[in-house]
Amino acid sequence: HGDPKFRRDVIGRIYENTKAIEAFDIATEAGLSTTCNFIIGYPYETLENCWKSVELASQLNCSDINAFIYTPYHGTPMRDMCVDAGFISDDLIVEMINNDQGSFLNMPRPYMNKKEIYDMYNNFGKYFRENTVQRDRIGEGKLRQLIA
């Protein structure tokens, strides 16, 4: 995820974006092929949070970048978080993953709705490429001002 605060508070991963960028640069310089997978539609995710993932994706030196819609698997703390927040019912059983189904979560504002999650998933590659071209054209600092 591209938002360090969201990544720390909701996902439980603590690292700065600069470290991720640096790690992918090192791997690429070493001749490794890399894949970066972004998950969209986490519980409590806003569009603003999600756009920070697009921004991060445009800065990563990856061979391949993919996006997937968050799935609330049984037995995970994040699924329990979704049930406790009322984003899904406790009896929901995810038998088969199909991103084209969209999100299982029903989140109120200010969080992403099902349409926003699906649209971001469906267009992530396009947004990432546009962001990369724009960054290269106008410079990274200016892009950060436009996205903020």
For the regions a language model picked out, list residue spans one by one.
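A structural motif corresponding to the C-terminal lobe/cap of the Radical SAM core domain
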Residues: 1-143
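C-terminal non-catalytic accessory extensions
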Residues: 144-148
